[in-house]
Every structure is written in structure tokens, then in C-alpha cells.
Amino acid sequence: FGDELIERSREPLDHPWFAEGQPPVILAVGRLHHQKGFDVLLTAFSAVLAESPSRLIILGEGEERDRLERQARKLGIGASVQFPGFVKNPYAYMSRAALFILSSRWEGLPGALIEAMACGCPVVATDCPSGPAEIIENGTQGEIVPVEDYHALAAAMKRMLNTPRGRGVDRARSFSTASAVDAYLVMLERAP
């Protein structure tokens, strides 16, 4: 990430759920696919919503949209969940969300997690192969929970929902292009 991400995160967002006085918004971003674990997130969110007024927005498109929308209705949380699809500027959502969730079953390098941290959003992520455990120092910049454990995910979401913003910004900077270039140059300087 860089200055462009930060600038785009400050762009206006015309969404009524982010108006002052509204319940906190929990955000997830990704392809609507089994890999992303949004089915687990919906179940966890239903437990959060039972105790704390909140809303869930899942940005992205994919083949599981209909199934996920049906699941939300079946859980009785349909009015508190939105699937806006693909949006050109997810950073405006990330900078305003109360919490970002990465519920994946597996990942490569989860860019959306790093971007959410760069936007100052508190995060909860699953301990899926490749990524979150290497990015988040559990308890410091966010929380890590077991994959597919909606009880643990819900508990972490409840704990993190009112966490102050900005805890992961410095850690996210270590994944910026400038940091990668600096690390590469240091490695070249040390080479024989």
C-alpha cells in the first residue's frame, strides 16, 4: 500500500450504514467463494448480533452469492447484512468500518487484511494457511482464531468490536512497496 490507498480511504462514502449514530459496521472483502469462509462469518455474525447491535457488509462477487444471501435470511440476520458486490473503492469502507474480518479457509498473502490494517481498521482473522499469523501479532494488531470455528470467531468479533482504530497501521507499513524495496536493497548490500 502507499499514499494512494490512504487518499482513497478518505474519499466520501455515501452509505447510510456509516452515518453518525448508526450501529457499528463489520466488514469483509473477497470473492464469494468457499475459500473465503463467509458462511462461517455469517453464523458468527448472527451470534454477535444477538448480543450487540451491529451490521455486516461483505464486498465482492462470486458463485456463492445466492447461497450466502439465503443463509443470512435463514439465520434471521438478512436485514443486518449487505452484499454490495464489487466496489471500486473498498478503502473508503475499510477506513470507516468498526472491524474487518478475514474468515478464509486458506489464503496466499491476504492483501485485503493488510489494506484494512493500513486504513486503521481493527482486524480478526482465521489462522488459515499462508498469511494472517505472519501478518498479525495476535493480540497486538488484531486477533487470530481457528479456521471454521464460528464460536471463536464470534467471541473475537465481540471483543474487538469496540477496539480503538489504528493498532495495525505500523505493521501494515512493513508490507508496503517502499518497505519491500528497502529490504531488498539491504539484502543486496549484504551480499558478498
Task: Enumerate the predicted regions with their spans.
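A conserved nucleotide-sugar
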Residues: E20-L32, F38-F83
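A charged, aromatic-enriched C-terminal amphipathic alpha-helix characteristic of glycosyltransferases
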Residues: R165-A191
